[in-house]
From Swiss-Prot:
Protein role: Catalyzes the degradation of levan mainly into levanbiose (difructose). Is not active on sucrose.
Family note: Belongs to the glycosyl hydrolase 32 family.
The encoding gene: levB
GO biological process: sucrose catabolic process
InterPro entries found in the cross-reference section: ConA-like_dom_sf (IPR013320), Glyco_hydro_32 (IPR001362), Glyco_hydro_32_C (IPR013189), Glyco_hydro_32_N (IPR013148), Glyco_hydro_beta-prop_sf (IPR023296)
Enzyme class name: hydrolase
Residues on Extracellular side: 27-516
CDD domains: GH32_Inu-like
A GO MF term: sucrose alpha-glucosidase activity
Protein name: Levanbiose-producing levanase
Species this chain originates from: Bacillus subtilis (strain 168)
Protein's cellular compartments: Cell membrane
Amino acid sequence: MNYIKAGKWLTVFLTFLGILLFIDLFPKEEHDQKTKSKQKPDYRAAYHFTTPDKWKNDPQKPIYFDGKYHYFYLYNRDYPKGNGTEWRHAVSEDLVHWTDEGVAIPKYTNPDGDIWTGSVVVDKENTAGFGKNALVAIVTQPSAKDKKQEQYLWYSTDKGKSFKFYSGNPVMPNPGTDDFRDPKVIWDDQDNKWVMVMAEGSKIGFYESDNLKDWHYTSGFFPEQAGMVECPDLYMMRASDGTNKWVLGASANGKPWGKPNTYAYWTGSFDGKEFKADQTEAQWLDYGFDWYGGVTFEDSKSTDPLEKRYALAWMNNWDYANNTPTMKNGFNGTDSVIRELRLKEQDGTYSLVSQPIEALEQLTVSTDEIEDQDVNGSKTLSITGDTYQLDTDLSWSELKNAGVRLRESEDQKRHIDVGIFAEGGYAYVNRAATNQPDKSNTYVESKAPYDVNKRKVHLKILVDKTTIEVFVGDGKTVFSNEVFPKPEDKGITLYSDGGTASFKNITVKHFDSIHE
């Protein structure tokens, strides 16, 4: 009897204790759900470079110095309420992970306005007189007197941590034109001198100097169907057939002629004073809406620096630069992934081809390999994600349209489409069915010609929280676009219209974040 009574009392006690625990846990669970629902969505890209806060736009050409890549970019600490840019500094050993070094050239420290785009070089032979291996930057600033665009020299003797204003500024006064900016400086090994290209409205000016201080005009290049040019670029590359070619590039506006508003380039010859293009019509490094202010730079670790180069750009567009939910996370400014460039010869034409740098592969945390799929209609994959690289070989016999829907919602109403419109003869990226920055809906489908008679294509697609970059085939055609899907939209669907499409070698590499 005593044992039975004790057992009953124990049962009652445990039941009462369980009720108390349930009452205590239920409100906590409800509170956790409410707290979770109030958390801000994370719109910071996982593996793309982003400004720590506020605003960034134009990249400056990175340099390799003292075992690291040094990257400067335009930064506005007062955004969105105040104007004016300055140069912020970051360093990297692998071009994937970056360490912020803070502001290197602050704005408004002299009467000549804020700091705009320019370029920085390592003065290995002390041609400017600031010391061997001094970093010398030439940047555009609006003059104190009449706000005209002029070129000013700053120099650093502490490995780019800070820069001093040269007392002899400006080194290039305005010659009497409205547009006179974005100087890009390179060393010409053939003639042992510095060469500069300058954006001058619809013209690219060429200049030379022995000491980075005294500059002389040598010639001008007038692009066709490129509109106003900015951020010019000049470099030599060795093509796939062994030919050395000079490449002249610039951010350009081809929209009035149905062309991109990204990075235009011309291959040709350069004699140290004048550039002559192989053909007058520009080629384009990117067909998306958001690859602007692009810069290229040397692979300084390579034994053959002419074989390949690197490139990156600001992923935004001046037509809608401030339309971004990333401000919920306190910033507006994302770069493209760094890509590897090679110069390919085909049928007598030389073209740049791009692929993401291999160093991105180190971010892979898991890989999904999906069996080959024949699709007539649509097929949703079981895997999901918002930070990954997807590769597939797409082929067909007869069809109108085929591709991949990315960042798809559960009800399949929201998505981004990447594919080949065989009936129209072009590749495309369409962001109309997801959140995206262009509120006018003018820039929703980016497209580029594609030879559909091949009846096959390899697609390499980089997906991040706010970006999508598509490398078509060998990478001669690339699309870079901003997108702002809801964080929960992570589906992937294969589709075809008007016939059967075959998707083979489907691989999805899920990437880790570069942020701590």
